[in-house]
Amino acid sequence: MSEEIITPVYCTGVSAQVQKQRARELGLGRHENAIKYLGQDYEQLRVRCLQSGTLFRDEAFPPVPQSLGYKDLGPNSSKTYGIKWKRPTELLSNPQFIVDGATRTDICQGALGDCWLLAAIASLTLNDTLLHRVVPHGQSFQNGYAGIFHFQLWQFGEWVDVVVDDLLPIKDGKLVFVHSAEGNEFWSALLEKAYAKVNGSYEALSGGSTSEGFEDFTGGVTEWYELRKAPSDLYQIILKALERGSLLGCSIDISSVLDMEAITFKKLVKGHAYSVTGAKQVNYRGQVVSLIRMRNPWGEVEWTGAWSDSSSEWNNVDPYERDQLRVKMEDGEFWMSFRDFMREFTRLEICNLTPDALKSRTIRKWNTTLYEGTWRRGSTAGGCRNYPATFWVNPQFKIRLDETDDPDDYGDRESGCSFVLALMQKHRRRERRFGRDMETIGFAVYEVPPELVGQPAVHLKRDFFLANASRARSEQFINLREVSTRFRLPPGEYVVVPSTFEPNKEGDFVLRFFSEKSAGTVELDDQIQANLPDEQVLSEEEIDENFKALFRQLAGEDMEISVKELRTILNRIISKHKDLRTKGFSLESCRSMVNLMDRDGNGKLGLVEFNILWNRIRNYLSIFRKFDLDKSGSMSAYEMRMAIESAGFKLNKKLYELIITRYSEPDLAVDFDNFVCCLVRLETMFRFFKTLDTDLDGVVTFDLFKWLQLTMFA
């Protein structure tokens, strides 16, 4: 019996991106078809463990010090001394995954500063549909137990299914991090572990905003309200948000490090994340009072002011209504008046849910669009409007607003189209251990002028932004994972430009667009095309005699110029141009030139071929000097983009990223020889494609031999 030959498949960075895009178009990454995180298949792993009679141990997030953290919880930290990893079955005789359903009291904070995450989990328990999108049914420490559990998390536009083992950090016989009040329930501790896994460690979860957890559990988009500047109808906004299943969180800002986790006179914790779990208006002494219900993940520290559990205000409320609203003492949940809420708290976060999270609800839903993008040094990281020379190279997205809001939505206000823009930077929490923190990000919105409305999706250039002011922008540039702002603008076309504050700050991002009415969106990018010069048909008689004499002197006895001879000639000439910064032409770049011009295929250049190349290089030199704006002898990566267009090539942003990576120096400068090599390579590839595209449909098909032939000698 012959064995099947195994053929390895290797994906380069570019091909991997293409493969990922194709998979997404087929539905991979939606909640119903979540990506298996790190390739781990929960069912396969569980069955394998059951068949072998072993308990699962996750080597992708092993029970070792590095999984706890890298600094404060690092391997040599005193805070991690004595921590062991144990399974719930080693701690209790009858551990449970969930007892009587998941409730807000299942989440009690441990030694980790992730109250923001726990507040989000607490809000999640209010909605069974949302909860079980994150915590799949059918998991247990009894039936089919194999020491393996899984959870589904939203990560930057994709749902991922995350597998964990049930080895949890233990100290002095107790869970170190999140735990339930019951003591024998472990779903919240295991969910925290899954979240730590996707972020690299438990320590990576320290510090954050509730909105981050909201979004990673729902795929929704979050709005922020500074309560000192809140709209007059905020209570109605909260009521409507709770009715729509939105998740809400709030906090009290700190004025110094000493304030962190400080407890106020009325038992509110500063710098601490609370979840908003309800809102209700009650009749109190003949007046309607607006109340709001809060939850503190710590559990035991509660508000002691008006409308707290033991306050006298409840004695003047109808007994039936009072019994419906009052909660148990010391569970971390409490009521307070909306007036006190506005006075005591600093900010409110509301996570609006995507339509797929609200399938069973007969309510109005957002229209949503998501784009992924990158900022790359020298090509697409142009910085904010403060840097006009480079701002235009940032990614651009066009929005077309057609329908205004329903009249009921804006009352007497001027009509317009409401939408939320949210810009999120990717993977920054996971990269903390490498010293990389959040970049300062934001975005600007520009109205498309009438003469450009309806035009193809062409990337807007520098002159447009120099001549036009922004129509709207994010409230601020800030170093948070996400910046979001609600807008209401008249119908029309607009261009959104997301950016870092400073140029050349690299990162990946997700831009999301939530609109109340249907709207059109498209990423602006130039269409790939080349205005190539006609291939010259010259005879030797048409060439200048002086050039012929020069050629005879350079070519030698065979009257042809080889690759090595071409390098010697070009480097001798370029060395005389003292204004050019160059290391000289390499053999590889000269070989590319010969391949482009060699018509008879002998690997050398004859008189006519060398004449055409010579004129081409003179033209390239003219373009190079034109776009070397500071006369430094080299071009910046951004100047090169304009120079390439001047040479007749229109490329999209992904190709510019590749070109800058390949042809620029570490300081993002492009010298003359690299510029020439780039243009020669571009022309060669365009001409190859044009030759093969016989039916002019922009698509060519070839076998492996032809592919290798083209790529080896281009």
From Swiss-Prot:
Gene3D superfamilies: 2.60.120.380, Cysteine proteinases, EF-hand. Its cofactor is Ca(2+). Residues 527-542 are annotated as: Linker. The record marks S15, A16, G27, L28 as: Cleavage. Undergoes calcium-induced successive autoproteolytic cleavages that generate a membrane-bound 78 kDa active form and an intracellular 75 kDa active form. Calpastatin reduces with high efficiency the transition from 78 kDa to 75 kDa calpain forms. One of its GO terms (biological process) is receptor catabolic process. It comes from the Eukaryota. Pfam families: Calpain_III, EF-hand_8, Peptidase_C2. GO terms for cellular component: calpain complex; cornified envelope; cytoplasm; cytosol; extracellular exosome; extracellular region; ficolin-1-rich granule lumen; focal adhesion. The active site is at C115, H272, N296. Residues 55-354 form the Calpain catalytic domain. Its main location: cytoplasm. Ca(2+) 1 binds at Q109, D114. Keywords: Acetylation, Autocatalytic cleavage, Calcium, Cell membrane, Cytoplasm, Disease variant, Hereditary spastic paraplegia, Hydrolase, Membrane, Metal-binding, Neurodegeneration, Phosphoprotein, Protease, Repeat, Thiol protease. Activated by micromolar concentrations of calcium and inhibited by calpastatin. Residues 541-576, 585-618, 615-650, 680-714 form the EF-hand domain. Ca(2+) 4 binds at D628, D630, S632, S634, E639. Calcium-regulated non-lysosomal thiol-protease which catalyzes limited proteolysis of substrates involved in cytoskeletal remodeling and signal transduction. Proteolytically cleaves CTBP1 at 'Asn-375', 'Gly-387' and 'His-409'. Cleaves and activates caspase-7 (CASP7). Belongs to the peptidase C2 family. This is Calpain-1 catalytic subunit.
